[in-house]
């Protein structure tokens, strides 16, 4: 039987990295699929650790945060959501357009984690969520979408994912769905054996959809995140935490180990979890003639804190490393 070598992947190869940070190559959209206990959280921790030196800010949307508190102390409470809404993506989009224009590619990066809250497939039909998949690389965003089970993404959205981490799946039905949604680059008859071989001892399979190659094994890698009992270090620049803690009363972390990032951060533009989210009549997103709350609805006035009516705040935070 022919043996096919599966190479180990390096998180440092994922954009942004030291090679791409000064360029317009743009961001990466990653999907992580694994059941509880598979090693999914350890992988997410490793992803955060690998990018903390070049990404100054993060927004987390986690449907399980109230139960497990995984991101507590990793990202400020101000920027942790417990429920997904397309309006969060809309505000991230507007913030990133302004941040990239004001600060350039190097200083405008944002990490967005959407963890265990994508069970409603209809959410992916919203125009802003689709824009994140289609054009998110131009927003300078690293997107990590983690879920326990395969999501029913439409084919055009699946084709927009840059990379997929797959943990071991023993259920044949779910394994077949995983293959159909994300892993069809591997010959179908080989897929069960490849998954069984690669995904042992908390390893996972990584499929790189950005590779232009005729050989499937050039796009398939294995990865095992290093396990550590220590808490995840705070993610983001000091001023990012300082701003958030000043609004919530959360205690500032004692240690920051990220590389110093210079320049302005449009912190006021980040969507804050403490603010009320826009709902659209119980729908998953706005209709063609619904842009958000009317002037008669509750919300911040022009003089109050938050986004102004045109979605642009004049607040800038610049003292990054006091």
Curated annotation (Swiss-Prot):
Residues 287-305 have a biased composition (Acidic residues). InterPro entries: A32L, P-loop_NTPase. Residues 277-322 are annotated as: Disordered. It comes from the Viruses. Gene3D superfamilies: P-loop containing nucleotide triphosphate hydrolases. This is Uncharacterized protein 015R. The lineage of its organism: Viruses, Varidnaviria, Bamfordvirae, Nucleocytoviricota, Megaviricetes.
């Amino acid at each position: 039987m022919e043996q096919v070598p599966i190479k180990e992947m390096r998180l440092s190869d994922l954009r942004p990295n030291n090679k791409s940070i000064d360029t317009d190559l743009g961001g990466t959209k990653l999907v992580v699929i694994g059941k509880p206990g598979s090693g999914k959280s350890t992988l997410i921790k490793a992803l955060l650790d690998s990018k903390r030196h070049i990404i100054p800010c993060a927004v987390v949307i986690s449907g399980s945060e109230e139960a497990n508190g995984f991101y507590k102390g990793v990202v400020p409470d101000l920027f942790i959501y417990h429920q997904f809404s397309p309006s969060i993506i809309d505000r991230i989009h507007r913030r990133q357009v302004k941040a990239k224009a004001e600060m350039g590619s190097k200083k405008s990066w944002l990490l967005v984690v959407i963890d265990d809250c994508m069970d409603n497939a209809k959410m992916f039909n919203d125009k802003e969520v689709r824009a994140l998949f289609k054009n998110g690389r131009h927003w300078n965003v690293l997107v990590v979408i983690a879920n326990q089970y395969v999501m029913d993404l439409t084919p055009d959205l699946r084709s927009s994912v840059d990379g997929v981490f797959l943990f071991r799946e023993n259920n044949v039905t779910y394994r077949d769905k995983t293959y159909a949604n994300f892993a069809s680059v591997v010959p179908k008859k080989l897929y069960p054996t490849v998954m069984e071989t690669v995904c042992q001892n908390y390893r996972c399979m990584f499929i790189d959809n950005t590779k232009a190659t005729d050989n499937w094994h050039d796009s398939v890698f294995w990865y095992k995140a290093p396990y550590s009992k220590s808490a995840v270090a705070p993610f983001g620049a000091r001023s990012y935490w300082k701003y958030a803690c000043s609004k919530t009363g959360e205690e500032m972390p004692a240690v920051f180990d990220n590389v110093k990032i210079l320049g302005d951060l449009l912190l006021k533009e980040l969507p804050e979890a403490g603010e009320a989210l826009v709902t659209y009549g119980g729908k998953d997103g706005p209709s063609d003639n619904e842009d958000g709350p009317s002037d008669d609805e509750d919300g911040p006035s022009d003089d109050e804190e938050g986004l102004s009516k045109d979605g642009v705040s004049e607040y800038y935070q610049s003292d990054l490393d006091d």
